[in-house]
């Protein structure tokens, strides 16, 4: 049907959701993607829930007017506080959120120490509390990392500045974490810096691949998969040439 050629919209507080977009494109290269990053208001993770809901609502309103066929909320903070509102407002629409990949982490390490590094809003949210309750584990450490998003937004994901930032955040956990859940879509871009601090023995988990698989499943069930040609369009509230250059770079970069 004609609607199957409409865009899959992917939204984030900035460029972090590109880590999810990469997984979507890898899994469904023939689809058409519209990525919107709200870098002018980043980070969401240090704002109030009310602010995040308002900004997410405004973004989705604009995108719905474009005739999109599905919405991927590729922002852990926006998913944590706004996904319920979006699903109530658009009950018949395909809306996929992202959540920290806690389930695979606790399944892999049922008796070992697992960390969840995320924004303060995500760590405080009821959605994460429910996720932890659904995946009981004897030793989960919550690790807030306010400031990490800003470094990724500045193009410093793999830099001495990122190392200096992460050292006090993750330093106390060196040799103590078997698994670390990356609870913000910006964080996978800092994988190299995280490994420099924690080493290679700590297994990193992020929810991008699972989100892409769920999106494919929902589109397939609805008969909305597209057979190409695929494309990716970037839009950003900052509307600055440097941010679009960063988007293209993050799409291509090997950050592992």
Task: Give the ranges of each region predicted by the language model.
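Non-catalytic structural scaffold of enzyme domains
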Residues: 1-256
